[in-house]
């Protein structure tokens, strides 16, 4: 698969900068004597200390390319080929996995805009949510204690793609009208990720020994997954349109999916399940358009007067950062404008924020009615909706790549 991080830096819902990650797996078959006439290949991933590449049967590498303009036809700059650390099999295979993994943080030369870093590898899952209960008809105590649920992802690992990129490499350098008789560089960017696979797969009925011999893949890269704002495809987009959303581009969101934001079903479902929490009544839901499609005025809305509403994670790159110990995990609605939906920090509780925004918290935020709505439109808008799971910003590392060491597979 081809994994891509896209940046829109002028508000037209089209990528201006893309970072592409293309992966390759290599076999290093380890064969040992076992009493027969010849050595025999072992079935395990490693034979001894897995921090020594000679003891590991497979390795994975990836190439990073920066594309300016259209993701397929734009100007391409290869940034290098790097190795990915082997997953944390267990404490017998790795005596010091944190130290081993740190050796795979790689520098990136981004030309005149500066230098960055990249790390691709296994990390502890940072997302916290009571997932099973959310999808069991929101089988929660939505007005109960914020830490009263179970984080079902607490013992899970993920493969993470982490980048540290200078702001100068991401923002548009053009001078634009910033309002109030000011001109300058628009500091707001929008970001989303995609995964693409080759359009055709031919399965080999008689694969040879080796690796990746079971199929031949070819044709154009075809997008099969997309993520901008968290939980949009999971709890906003209707079931029949989930594949369509995954294959779509942000510039087409209004044409394809506007009714899911204008007339969302989640608040109606919450009201049906919990009658004491009436759904907002302002239709179309301009407050959700502001939160999910355009950005919040004065916080993370692009300066482009012809802004194209689209699902992406928007960030004002000039917002001062807040140290972990002082962060409010409710982000903007908690008074911390450096948090979600102005970007997304690892410790931000995007589930609680999304629930509260869906139920109309922005109607009580004092923003202009044309940007959101008024308090009378959302009678339950100030209710502290929660899935009962929290995660502190101080639970993460203070240095890149910030996400914690993965859980050992042998635990």
Outline where the language-model segments fall.
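Surface-exposed extracytoplasmic segments
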Residues: 1-411
């Amino acid at each position: 698969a081809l994994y891509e991080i896209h940046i829109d830096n002028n508000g037209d819902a089209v990528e201006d900068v893309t970072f592409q990650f293309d992966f390759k797996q290599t076999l290093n078959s380890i064969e040992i004597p076992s009493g027969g006439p010849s050595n025999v290949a072992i079935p395990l991933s490693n034979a001894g200390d897995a921090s020594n590449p000679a003891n590991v049967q497979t390795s994975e590498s990836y190439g990073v390319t920066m594309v300016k303009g259209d993701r397929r036809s734009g100007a391409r700059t290869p940034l290098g080929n790097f190795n990915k650390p082997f997953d944390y099999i267990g404490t017998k295979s790795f005596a010091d996995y944190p130290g081993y993994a740190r050796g795979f943080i790689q520098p990136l030369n981004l030309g005149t805009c500066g230098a960055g870093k990249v790390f691709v590898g296994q990390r502890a899952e940072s997302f916290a949510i009571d997932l099973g209960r959310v999808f069991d008809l929101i089988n929660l105590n939505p007005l109960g204690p914020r830490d009263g649920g179970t984080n079902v992802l607490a013992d899970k690992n993920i493969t993470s793609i982490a980048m540290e990129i200078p702001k100068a490499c991401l923002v548009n350098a053009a001078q634009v009208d910033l309002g109030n008789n000011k001109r300058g560089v628009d500091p707001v960017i929008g970001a989303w990720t995609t995964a693409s696979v080759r359009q055709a797969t031919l399965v080999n009925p008689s694969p040879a020994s080796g690796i990746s011999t079971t199929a031949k893949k070819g044709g154009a890269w075809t997008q099969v997954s997309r993520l901008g704002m968290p939980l949009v495809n999971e709890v906003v987009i209707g079931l029949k349109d989930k594949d369509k959303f995954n294959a779509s581009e942000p510039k087409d969101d209004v044409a394809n999916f506007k009714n899911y934001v204008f007339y969302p079903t989640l608040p109606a479902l919450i009201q049906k399940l919990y009658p004491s929490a009436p759904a907002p009544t302002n239709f179309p839901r301009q407050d959700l358009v502001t939160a999910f499609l355009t950005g919040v005025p004065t916080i993370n809305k692009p300066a482009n007067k012809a802004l194209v509403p689209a699902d992406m994670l928007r960030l004002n790159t000039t917002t001062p950062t807040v140290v972990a110990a002082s962060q409010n995990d409710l982000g903007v609605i908690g008074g911390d404008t450096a948090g979600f939906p102005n970007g997304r920090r690892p410790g931000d509780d995007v589930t609680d924020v999304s629930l509260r925004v869906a139920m109309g918290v922005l109607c009580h935020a004092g923003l202009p009615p044309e940007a959101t709505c008024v308090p009378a439109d959302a009678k339950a808008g100030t209710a502290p909706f929660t899935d009962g799971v929290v995660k502190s910003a101080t639970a993460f590392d203070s240095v890149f790549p910030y996400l914690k060491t993965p859980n050992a597979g042998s635990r």
